[in-house]
Amino acid sequence: MTTHHTIRSSYDNLGLAMLISEPSGTPKGIVQIVHGMCEHKERYIPFMEYLSDAGYICIIHDHRGHGESVISEEDLGYMYKGGWQALVEDIHSVRLEAEKMFPPLPYTLIGHSMGSMAVRSYTKRYDDTIDTLFVCGCPSYNNARWAGSILAHLTAFFRGGHYRSRLLQKLSFGTYNRPFAKEGYPNAWVCSDQDILEQYHKDPLCMFTFTANGFVNLLALMKDCYSPKGWKMSRKHLPVHFISGADDPCLISVADINKAVARMRQVGYADTDLKLFPGMRHEILNETNRKEVWDYVLERLPHD
């Protein structure tokens, strides 16, 4: 059973739209999913239903500036004044809501793409609230981040935070589709499932350009989650699972994704591992052979 809810961000009282999928029997645990950039919670319903059929309560919310967590449609891709810090605190607001709604159960946090950065920044501050972490579709650290950040700040200053810059969009993602250009989709790098791509390209809640404010905060979030400073690490044996498609251009290279894994070990999480799925692109939870990924995740979920 999947139900709709709305809660308020503890950061700035923004309405956060949320979905909850519950199992029919006694729940084994809770899984909170944190989605990526330029998408929304409904895209994860099949995965949520798979997990709830296996006995898990699944929760997901729309990030600020995404889906239904906006004041107006003009705010898609805009993170408001709270920015990336509020985005991270929104994850905690959902975690606290789950605590109110359900009995104490093993708690898993799964973040995809931009969400994979957000869940690491969340873990940096609140690792005592989770029992397992999945880092899915992780963007490797981009050494040009600082230049992009300067450009995004200048754009926001001179054109306004709501300005949508094609240049920022191109610099951020312009090369990702080159290996798949012959397939005829501008975002074929996302996954190889043609039905998913058709839905993606027809979905106005996916096919929007991030605002200058959004890019400022996206790049600041990348800096925070990769920085070795400020980690309030209290659970050194927290299982941290990096999972990505081997053909995901966000990886940059295997060496780069291994640096992300090494960083988590460096800050103290000894039980960190990496699984690359051959032939899969960015959205491994939506790939043609996604059941393989779903099964992999399910096998590693903590439960009572």
Annotate each language-model stretch with its function.
Residues 242-244:
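Short beta-strand/loop motif that positions the catalytic acidic residue
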Residues 43, 48-74:
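Conserved alpha/beta-hydrolase
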Residues 1-25:
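N-terminal cap/lid segment of alpha/beta-hydrolase-fold proteins
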Residues 267-304:
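Catalytic active-site module of serine/aspartate enzymes centered on a nucleophile-bearing elbow/loop
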Residues 119-205:
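Alpha/beta-hydrolase-fold enzymes
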Residues 31, 35-39, 113, 246-247:
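Active-site glycine-rich loops that stabilize anionic/oxyanionic intermediates
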Residues 101-113:
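Alpha/beta-hydrolase fold nucleophile elbow
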Residues 79-99:
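Alpha/beta-hydrolase active-site loop
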